[in-house]
Structure formats: C-alpha cells, structure tokens
Regions:
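Glycine-rich, hydrophobic membrane-spanning regions of integral membrane proteins that mediate transport
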Residues: 2-454
Length: 454
C-alpha cells in the first residue's frame, strides 16, 4: 500500500503512466548496432547496383505521403489505462528501487539547500550571544532594582540617570501647577472612596493610579479618554473587580469633544509621570485580574505581587529604564546582521534589517529570538538570586514572548510550508525543462503527420 494519499486526478495520472510504462516495456526495440549494420549492408548493395543511397533518400521524401495521427483525449487515455491496469496504481511501481532511492536523495538535498539558507553559522550565533550578554550586563549592573530612599527612588546608574532626566524634563513645581490647573483635571482621578457610589477596594493615594485604567500609559488612551467623555471612572480594584461608575462630584471635568478629551488625557499623563507614586508600567493594571497563585512565604497571589512591585517603585519611568537593555539587544543583533550581510556581498539596501520577513532576511528573526532568550534567562537568574520580583525586566519578557511566538509559528507552520514551496519550485523548474524537450520532440515527430486532436 502506498504511503501517499492521492487525489482523483493523481490516481488517473498514475494509471496512465503505469499503462504507458507497461506498453513501452512490451515494445521490442532492435539494438542500434544491428540496425546500423543492416543499413550499411543495404547501402553497400545499392552502390554495387549503381545507385546512390543519398539520391534515393531525397527521392523518397518527394513521394512520401503524410499519415494521419489521432491524439486521444485525456478521458480516452484514462479509460484505456483503467481497462488494462485498473485504478489503484502506485506511482512508485514504475520506478526501480535504485531510482526511488535516487529520488529520495534528490528531495533530501533540496530540503538541505533550503535549510542551509536559514541555518545560523558560528558568526550569527556569536552576534546573538554577544547581544544577550551585553543586554544582561546592562540590566544587572546599570538598571538594577529600584529602592525607596530619603532622596527618592534609586536604582542602578542608568536607572538613576533616566529618572533624573524625567525630573529635569518635567520639573516638580511646574508639574504641581499643571496638576492643580483645570486643564489636567479628569473625572477618573479619585484618590479614595469619598466620592464613589460603588466602593473600589484598595483605592488610595498610593494605589489609585494602578487601579484606574485611565492612568495606564496604553489603556488610558482608550478607557481614560472614554471616561473623560462620559464623566466616569473605570477601575480594576485590588480584589480583581471591574467597576465603571459615574463620578457626579467630578462632572465639571468632562469634555464633549474627543480631541479635547485626548489632549486632556495627555496633559494629565504629563502631570502624573514624575509623582512619588507615578504612572504604572503599560498594561500593569490588568494584573489586578490575576487573583490566583500562592507565591513566596506570604503565599501571595500574582495580583498582590504586582501591587507590591508598584508600591516599591516599579512605575513607568522604571519601565523606560528597563527597556534600554532590550533595545541594546535589538541594536547589536540588527547592526551585526547588517554588517555581516554587507561583507557577504549583499547590497546595502538589502542588508538593512528593519523587516523580519524571512524571505528577505532568513536568519534575523532566529538571531533575535536567541539573543532575547539569553537576556531573558539572565533576568530570570537575577530574579531567582535576589528573590525580588521588582528585578523582573518587564520589557525584556515582552520581547521574549513576542519572538518566542514568532519562532514557534515559524518552526511549526511557516518553515515547512516555505520548504515545500521551495522544493516544489525546483522540481517544477526541472519538469518545465523536460516538458519543453518533450514538446520539441513531438513537434519534430509530427512534421511527417497530420495531427488530429479529438
């Protein structure tokens, strides 16, 4: 039984090929040596009788009449083949064992040709490893872990530099004036439950920005703007409850125009970004929904762990600091990839590593996956040895998740499909050459016939 599953057309093709193969095998072809010897004897006899064979050939061509050749339809070919060999023919049957092994070897070589294009060499792996090591070193030595001190939040040298930059860019006095002005007041900015109609667990001056979706740097542009337009406050409280309520006491903070609401949202972000309990990291508010887990000696849930991280200084500015190691990994890999491509002789415009399209840049996505996997593993070690969840590099884990998904999709779905297309393309190129040769042979053969197609 064949290991292949054939379509109806392929079954018909197999029957026709099997029948034609058997028909050719039944034809007795005299050896070319015998034929040449017979022709030579006939020409010698003609010359002995005073004839010139060359002239007889020219004479014969003048008197030769063209025969009629009828080409059957595909349906007729199939019917004839099925009468002789049936409908359950296997394509492998018309090949010898040696030919089948040769075919398998050819397919294996084509697969290997495709794999070589996407396989990383020592330089590719070295670039990815270097990026991972540099990113991990920056994360451990320069970003560090935020700690509350008498002088404010302090971390590694790089984290302190980023926080100082934000403080200089958004001076405390100016931000205080902005926060007290009407242009920055929003209806969702309640700091406790005094003005709420539905109690929000954990709502306080310390945690209100973590609980209110309007303060999320990403979700705020959806929920925050919507709350400004409707005069509401949308929260996910400490217990994981989603609450959306009208804030009657803050009705004067509403806006009726979406562009005015968007502008107010941006201004409010600006006024809050450098406060002692600043904006949370992007999407951090959603972790309040994760009311499960039994982590550490205190047996905390994931939501409680994240709430504690925010309290310890895991805010938007620290998120920006943590983004730098992940960015460094990206830059080193992409720059190294581009330099290597240029040295290999590729054009500069074809070496610019902006796209992750594997047909244009076969190895780039895999190199980025390896580099981010290494940097993420180092961060996991940092968290393990410090036993401090604030050491988690959130942007690095996001990058790792992104490239892991892409790599998994590539290995399981895209790579087999592209490899099959590559192999089929090569086979079709050879088939086109064979068909062109067959058509040329048929045209030459048909010169002496009147061809009729049914």
């Amino acid at each position: 039984m064949s290991k292949f599953k054939y379509t109806e057309f392929e079954k018909q093709m197999n029957s026709v090929l099997t029948h034609q193969d058997e028909a050719l095998a039944d034809i007795h072809f005299p050896s070319s040596d015998e034929t040449d010897a017979t022709i030579a004897k006939a020409e010698a006899l003609l010359r002995s009788l005073g004839y010139k064979p060359e002239l007889l050939k020219e004479l014969a061509s003048f008197h030769q009449l063209k025969k009629i050749m009828v080409v059957p339809t595909w349906k007729e070919l199939c019917a004839e083949a099925e009468r002789h060999v049936g409908t359950h023919c296997e394509l492998e049957s018309i090949f010898t064992e040696e030919e089948l092994r040769s075919n398998e070897l050819a397919i294996h070589q084509l697969n290997e040709e495709f794999n070589v294009v996407h396989r990383l060499d020592a330089f590719d792996i070295s670039i990815a490893a270097l990026a991972a090591l540099v990113g991990a070193a920056v994360d451990i030595l320069l970003v560090g872990i935020p700690n509350k001190t008498s002088g404010g939040l302090k971390g590694g040298p790089l984290a302190n530099y980023i926080r100082d930059y934000f403080d200089k860019k958004f001076p405390e006095e100016e931000m205080q004036k902005l926060a007290n002005s009407k242009v920055s007041k929003v209806p969702y900015d309640a700091q406790d439950n005094r003005h709420t109609t539905i109690r929000v667990e954990g709502l306080s001056a310390y945690y209100h920005r973590l609980l209110q979706l309007g303060h999320d740097p990403l979700l705020g542009f959806i929920f925050g703007v919507a709350d400004i337009l409707t005069g509401r406050m949308t929260t996910i409280d400490k217990a994981g409850n989603i609450v959306s309520q009208v804030m009657e006491n803050y009705a004067d903070r509403k806006e009726s125009d979406i562009f005015a609401a968007l502008a107010k949202q941006v201004i409010h972000f600006k006024s809050d970004v450098t406060t002692s309990m600043g904006l949370p990291a992007p999407l951090m508010s959603l972790f309040n929904l994760l009311q499960f887990g039994n982590i550490g000696e205190e047996e905390q849930t994931i939501a409680e762990i994240v709430q504690g991280m925010y309290y310890e200084g895991y805010d938007f500015i620290h998120f920006c600091s943590m983004s730098i190691p992940a960015m460094i990994v990206e830059v080193i890999v992409r720059l190294g990839y581009a330099i290597k491509r240029i040295k290999e002789g590729h054009a500069v415009k074809d070496s610019i590593p902006l796209s992750l399209n594997r047909e244009k840049h076969p190895k780039l996505a895999t190199m980025l996956f390896i580099a981010h996997a290494g940097a993420t593993a180092a961060n996991a070690g940092k968290v393990y040895f410090t036993q401090n969840p604030v050491a988690i590099n959130y942007p690095q884990w996001i990058a790792f998740a992104k490239y892991s998904y892409g790599q998994l999709k590539w290995v399981l779905l895209e790579k087999p499909t592209l490899r099959d297309a590559y192999v089929r393309g090569k086979i079709n190129e050879e088939l086109d050459a064979v068909l062109a040769e067959a058509n040329a042979s048929f045209d030459m053969f048909a010169e002496d016939y009147i061809v009729v197609f049914n």
